[in-house]
Amino acid sequence: MENNIRLGKISAVDYAAGTVRVVYHEKDDAVTAPIPLISSEYFMPEVDDMVMVLHLSNGTEAGVVLGRPWSEKNKPPEGSKGLYRKELARSPGEAMIRYKDGTMTIKAAKLVIDGTVTVSGDVTAGGVSLDNHTHTDSMGGGTSGPS
């Protein structure tokens, strides 16, 4: 049962099958058979990413990738108590969901919502409040806010 949990590096990725091969440099560069990741989400690691693997036997044939530990290459993008942050792209902050202290932030280059959107509070876009904005009338004067 020695060395059933190991750190290794991804040597190959099969995106369609959702499996990877892991190389163990400290084990004479032994490479696993294709093994799956434990995840219900799809975000595959890349070649050379460090991963933690649970082996179900003494060999390298049966195992599962438990995840990517924080490392010099994979640092937390930020950290504080009560923070939830899910990165959705390889570069931190490029595409993510963040929640802290009652505020949720969704960030992406483009956001597509396929369905009806209902908002119960004010909507602000480009610094303009939908509830409290005014327009200039045809005579150059201001109008009252929306009613």
What residue ranges belong to the model's regions?
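Exposed beta-strand/loop interface patches that mediate assembly or binding
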Residues: 1-94, 98-99, 143-147
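Short, flexible coil/turn micro-motifs enriched in small/turn-prone residues
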Residues: 3, 43, 58, 110, ...
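Low-complexity, small-hydrophobic/phenylalanine-enriched stretches
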Residues: 97-98, 103-129, 133-135
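Protruding loop/beta-arch "assembly-hinge" segments enriched in small, turn-prone residues
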Residues: 131-147
